[in-house]
Amino acid sequence: MRTHPDFPNLFILDHPLIQHKLSHMRDRQRSTMGFRQLLKEIALLMGYEITRDLPLTTEAIETPLCTMDAPVIEGKKLAIVPILRAGLIMAEGLLELVPAAREGHIGLYRDHDTKMPVEYLVKLPDPAGRRFILVDPMLATGNSAVHAVDVLNRNGVLDAQIRFMALVAAPEGVRTFHAAHPTVPVFTAGLDSHLNPNAYIVPGLGDAGDRLFGTK
């Protein structure tokens, strides 16, 4: 994992396995099934880093030889919140890593004319004492990510409780996001070159939602 000189609160997960799988996802010939499976695998691998600083507690257990106070994390103190619909598959990967975590949902779609997010669903677990991992494959303009964090704030979640995880990010999106929420760390597998006039990340991987679900 490395940082970026222009974005001090951006963390790029450059593990070889993550980069290898991301390259396969970028390939336009990748099938829907293959694209979906790769995203789930990358999310699980990214989850290892994004949960690195989860606090541990102890639990008394019995091994075959003795009793001990064993270090454990409290999965119920973690909430995974995908931005629908594309974030759902990333959430699946994270839930394999921490199956006891709670799951919320924020439904947004991007207006094709204004490029701004439109909200249609919000379902969240109790925020008290809980860390929230907000997930979306693409951090493009940054507008949806900012809106989603605003939704969490509106429901009692502080910026200090939030981590944002994206498969691929554009510099424009990172700037927009951190202009609004400078203390929320962003974790990504790839910081790409730029946005094109249609607000797609270049080189990117196309429309993640359409490629995940086989729609147009």
UniProtKB/Swiss-Prot annotation:
Notes on activation and inhibition: Allosterically activated by GTP.
One Pfam family per UniProt: UPRTase
EC number, UniProt record: 2.4.2.9
InterPro entries referenced in this protein's UniProt entry, alphabetically: PRibTrfase_dom (IPR000836), PRTase-like (IPR029057), Upp_B (IPR034332), UPRTase/APRTase (IPR050054), Ura_phspho_trans (IPR005765)
Residues noted as binding 5-phospho-alpha-D-ribose 1-diphosphate in the record, renumbered to the chain: R85, R110, D136, P137, M138, L139, A140, T141, G142, N143, S144, D207
Protein's GO biological process: UMP salvage; uracil salvage
Function: Catalyzes the conversion of uracil and 5-phospho-alpha-D-ribose 1-diphosphate (PRPP) to UMP and diphosphate.
PANTHER family registered for this protein in UniProt: ADENINE PHOSPHORIBOSYLTRANSFERASE (PTHR32315), URACIL PHOSPHORIBOSYLTRANSFERASE, CHLOROPLASTIC (PTHR32315:SF4)
Protein name as catalogued: Uracil phosphoribosyltransferase
Source organism of the structure: Rhodospirillum centenum (strain ATCC 51521 / SW)
Taxonomic path: Bacteria, Pseudomonadati, Pseudomonadota, Alphaproteobacteria, Rhodospirillales
UniProt gene name: upp
